[in-house]
Each structure stands twice: as structure tokens, then as C-alpha cells.
């Protein structure tokens, strides 16, 4: 059974939750052993996969969990806005560290390495390639280039203003165009995640609402302050 077939089976049985275990940088939780513990807890709670950033975090997580890991490396580049897995060496390192799926930025922006080359390198390692996209055009272009999975990860993050709500219309448009879609980005409640499935998502990635304690506390603090004013 292929990984995609196994994921199809697990998603049908468990609902399609993927947990992104990426603590706020510099947080007390930003340690490989804590990231791995969060990933294991997510697996035990029914997540069908986890999304992990960084080689040390990935290696530690791989030693604990049995679910597939979506691996990424984030970089801040001087000459490109692309942050997610921008280099071929990043793909190689993620493959060696145990990722089953490698995600790359799939937007049509200036970048050090073409998307096509990154996807080909992932497939060279016999792994699944995921493209983190911001629009229908991005998604369809990446699908034509061979991406196995299209994520809505970058929707709202390539423009000056980021909306509060997730981009459900993008999920539907990509699904209707024949893409295998992972909905990602601002799915901060079970209701929104469920809506993504209704719009055609194959699975839904949730990060901040599960694994970023500072964000969750901020939401509660803001609501309590408003109630008290």
C-alpha cells in the first residue's frame, strides 16, 4: 500500500486532522524534545500526520511517532520572500532526517531555486511532494509540475493584510480542479476545520490553535479584556 493510500485509509477512519507542531520561536516550548512530545500527543489523540519544522525537531519527532511527518525548513533570505524549504540541500536534509512528505513554497515569487526543481528533488528521494500555495493559479501550476499535495498554507500571507478567516473558497476551487488539498492557515476552531472538509479538503492542518500556547492565551486574554471593558 502506498503512503497516499495509507493516508486515505487513515483519513477515512480518523477525520483528517494534521497537527503542525511549530512553537513560537524562542518560546520555552521551542525545544526538540518538547516538539516531539507534542507530536506524539497529537498522534495519540488521532492526528493522521504531523508537520514539523527544522532538522533537529524532525529527527527527534521521527524517533517517537509512527504517523507520516510533513517536513519543512524555514529560512529568512535577503533576496527572496520565500521561506519554506527554498533550497535543494534543504530537501536532501529533510529526506535524510525522516520526512515522508516534504513541503515547499509553491508561490510564483522570486526564489533561489525553481519549484519544479524542488519537486523533482523530493521525488528523487521517493517521497511525497507538497506545495504550499496562495492561489488557484499557484496550486494548478504546482500540480502540473508534479506536486502530489496542494496546501492552502500561503493564502493571506503573500499580501500586506492577512484576513482573520481561512480561505475556504480556495479549498473548494482547488478541489474542484482535481487537486488533493490540505487546508491550512487560520483554521483556529473545530468548526472551521470541519467546514474545510465540506469544501473538499482532503485533510486539515491546525497549528496555532493546538500547539502555540502564546497565541491561544492571547485569544483568551483579548476576549476577557473586551468583556471587562
UniProtKB/Swiss-Prot annotation:
The GO molecular function terms of this record are: N-acylglucosamine-6-phosphate 2-epimerase activity
- Tell me which EC number(s) this protein carries: 5.1.3.9
Any one Gene Ontology cellular component term annotated for this protein: cytosol
Keyword Nucleus annotated: no
| Regions that span the bilayer | none
Q: Name one Pfam family in it.
A: NanE
Q: Which InterPro entries match?
A: Aldolase_TIM, NanE, RibuloseP-bd_barrel
Sorted keywords for this record are:
Carbohydrate metabolism, Isomerase
Question: In which pathway does this enzyme or protein participate?
Answer: Amino-sugar metabolism; N-acetylneuraminate degradation; D-fructose 6-phosphate from N-acetylneuraminate: step 3/5
EC primary class: isomerase
Example GO biological process term?
carbohydrate metabolic process
Listed HAMAP family: ManNAc6P_epimer
Describe the function of this protein.
Answer: Converts N-acetylmannosamine-6-phosphate (ManNAc-6-P) to N-acetylglucosamine-6-phosphate (GlcNAc-6-P).
PANTHER family tied to this protein: N-ACETYLMANNOSAMINE-6-PHOSPHATE 2-EPIMERASE-RELATED
From the Swiss-Prot or TrEMBL record, give the protein name.
Putative N-acetylmannosamine-6-phosphate 2-epimerase
Organism equals: Salmonella agona (strain SL483)
Amino acid at each position: 500500500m502506498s503512503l497516499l493510500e495509507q493516508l486515505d485509509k487513515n483519513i477515512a477512519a480518523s477525520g483528517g486532522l494534521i497537527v503542525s507542531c511549530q512553537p513560537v520561536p524562542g518560546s520555552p516550548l521551542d525545544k526538540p524534545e518538547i516538539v516531539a512530545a507534542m507530536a506524539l500527543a497529537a498522534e495519540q489523540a488521532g492526528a493522521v500526520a504531523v508537520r514539523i519544522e527544522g532538522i533537529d525537531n524532525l529527527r527527534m519527532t521521527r524517533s517517537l511517532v509512527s504517523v507520516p511527518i510533513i517536513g519543512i525548513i524555514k529560512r529568512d533570505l535577503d533576496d527572496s520572500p520565500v521561506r519554506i524549504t527554498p533550497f535543494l540541500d534543504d530537501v536532501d536534509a529533510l529526506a535524510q532526517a525522516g520526512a515522508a512528505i516534504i513541503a515547499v513554497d509553491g508561490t510564483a515569487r522570486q526564489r533561489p531555486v525553481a519549484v519544479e526543481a524542488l519537486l523533482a528533488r523530493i521525488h528523487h528521494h521517493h517521497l511525497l511532494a507538497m506545495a504550499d500555495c496562495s492561489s488557484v493559479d499557484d496550486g494548478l501550476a504546482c500540480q502540473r509540475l508534479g506536486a502530489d499535495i496542494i496546501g492552502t498554507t500561503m493564502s493571506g500571507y503573500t499580501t500586506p493584510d492577512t484576513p482573520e478567516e481561512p480561505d475556504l473558497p480556495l479549498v473548494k476551487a482547488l478541489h474542484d480542479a482535481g487537486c488533493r488539498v490540505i487546508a491550512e492557515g487560520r483554521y483556529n476552531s473545530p468548526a472551521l476545520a470541519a467546514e474545510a472538509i465540506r469544501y473538499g479538503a482532503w485533510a486539515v492542518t491546525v497549528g496555532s490553535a493546538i500547539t502555540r500556547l502564546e497565541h491561544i492565551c492571547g485569544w483568551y486574554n483579548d476576549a476577557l479584556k473586551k468583556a471587562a471593558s
